Amino acid sequence: WSDQFPHIKATGDISGDCSYEKISKKNYKGKTLKINTHAVPVIGQPTALHAEQFAKLTGATVDVTHTPAGDLYAKAMVPFKAGQAPYDIVFGFSNFINDWRQYLAPVPKKYLNTVEMKDVTKSHVGVSSWDGTMYQYPVDGDRHYLKYRKDVIDNPEMQKKYKADTGKELKVPTTWKEYGEMAKYFNGWDWDGDGEKEYGSAEVMKKDDLMFAAFFSRSVAYAKNPSTPGGFFFDLETMKPNVNNPGFVEALTDWVEATKYVPPGGINFGLGDEIGSFGGGQTLFSFSWDDAFIAAMQDDSPIKNKVGTAPLPGADKVWNRVSGKWDNKYNQAPYIVWGWAVGVAKKSKVQEMAFDYLCFFSNGANHQADLAIGNFGVNPFKNSDFDPKLYTETMGWD
């Protein structure tokens, strides 16, 4: 099938219940599937690509609408509440599940039992489900972590220069304060010799474009205290939002300072901008989803195999919401950040076709190909995604 669909040239078709071979036997001629998804490229581009492939294989007509991140919730919820279903498939964020689930068709048993679904990690089955019922079809997995330039951080000459100029060690930062200090130092000069200025950090700072997730990743070090389980977003007794407590304020103070070490225009970076900036070699650091790291490891990236990863930085103090004081101890809280989610409208008249499309979207061949493209926004969520051979042999990473 790779001769007809070059997207899967690295693997060809991969055996499964929703493989190219299996889906090609479906006949949806005369039927139309309507999808609302995110704007291109992130998740919107693979949605459109797999829609085109699905149409070619099955004879279906597939209409894809692209919507900005900030409007995805309302684009589905407004017609849902009016008893309408203008889209058979709606993409959004997995934290929409409680509001959307009454309007979504539960994933049928035959799809729960597919080879593809049985490969999904337990955590992402949980993210897609409510009270044991799966309402959102797993197509993506999320986690935030640190990305950095190994050719700088691990460079003995750079380490020597940084030590001489600052009196501090150049190493992978373990606190947000260290992250900021290093990012400032490496901001605004050509430190990799490519003839262009580089900058400290690429971050998602644009309003209504996933900046909330970036802020939470900065906040957890200061506000997620292991001594006070739960209650990160709200007080467990009063449901008063915690966002104004000193932990969140400290993170916001750091983030305001970060506006001084991002590239020109960086305070308006959306996710796609962050991916292109770090992936294209413009910055020393980045943190968010896998996408920027994947972009940096693509064959067309000037920094392929020059990047490293580490858990999110921590902090030397963490707010204790119970005592109302700072606990002066090191705290690091890796953050799993929901994921792109998608469901089938309960009032859709083509539910089987819709679920076939979603199963095809995430089949083995498509998923492995999608993982290798940074701005597609598809990240690991299957057990097989954590086999190193997928990246070293199939994708050619060091």
Label for each model-derived stretch:
Residues N95-A105, H124-K168, G180, E203-L236, ...:
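Periplasmic solute-binding protein
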Residues W1-N27, F93-K147, A214, G308-L312, ...:
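Hinge/lid segment of periplasmic solute-binding proteins
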Residues D17-S24, P41-T61, K147, D151:
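Short, polar/charged alpha-helical segment
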Residues L49-S123, S129-Q136, N155-E157, K161, ...:
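Extracytoplasmic "Venus flytrap"/periplasmic binding protein-like
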Residues G132, K260, D300-D385:
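Extracytoplasmic/periplasmic substrate-recognition and gating elements
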Residues H66-K75, T174-E178, G266-G280:
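Short helix-initiation/N-cap motifs at beta->coil->alpha
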Residues E178-K184, A214, Y222-N268, P311-K317:
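Glycine-centered hinge/linker elements that transmit conformational signals in sensory
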Residues W1-K34, A55-K56, N187-K197, M353:
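Immediate post-signal peptide segment of exported/extracytoplasmic ligand-binding proteins
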